[in-house]
């Protein structure tokens, strides 16, 4: 499929922080994470609010912006999506976020299906360089010009991982790109 340009050639990149998440969790907690594919709220919050981790994501994109092209970031939770998108915009990178319909008492942000559709259209039209999302762009959305995905949320689900990676793998014969970055 790659040779026929139906799929993009994947280029995998990994970046690391010195942060550890879940060191204090016992075996039962780790088994629960694997079974439910859901992080405990404390770990999700720690990841979402990590200034060093979020800065690394934005700086990595900024350094390779020409190579990465249009990018989807898979965030840990709503707060993470809002923070990452704000950091991208502060760095001069046009970004927005999409999440499920919410009215968040903590952040005061209301997002509707119409808001998400408007943001998706802006991304499709090239008005946004980065689209940050929480559990929305894993399936059923056609964004063929996506060249890079940042997997900023963990998963143990091979199905979810395949769906996230697949957002960038549409090849030129299918209206996409010749190569795709999985970060």
Model-based region annotation:
Residues 94-183:
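Conserved RecA-like P-loop NTPase helicase motor core
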């Amino acid at each position: 499929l790659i040779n026929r340009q139906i799929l993009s050639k994947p280029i995998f990149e990994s970046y690391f922080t010195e942060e550890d998440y879940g060191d204090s969790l016992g075996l039962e907690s780790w088994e629960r994470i694997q079974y439910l594919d859901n992080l405990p709220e404390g770990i999700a919050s720690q990841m979402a609010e990590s200034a060093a981790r979020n800065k690394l994501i934005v700086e990595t994109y900024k350094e390779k912006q020409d190579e990465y092209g249009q990018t989807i970031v898979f965030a840990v939770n709503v707060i993470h999506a809002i923070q990452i998108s704000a950091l991208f915009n502060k760095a001069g990178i046009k970004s927005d976020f999409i999440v499920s319909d919410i009215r968040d008492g903590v952040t005061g942000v209301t997002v509707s299906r119409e808001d998400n559709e408007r943001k998706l259209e802006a991304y499709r039209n090239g008005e946004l360089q980065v689209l940050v999302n929480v559990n929305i762009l894993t399936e059923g959305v056609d964004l063929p010009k996506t060249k890079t995905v940042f997997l900023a949320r963990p998963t143990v689900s091979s199905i979810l991982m395949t769906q996230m990676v697949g957002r960038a793998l549409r090849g030129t014969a299918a209206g996409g790109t010749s190569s795709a970055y999985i970060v």
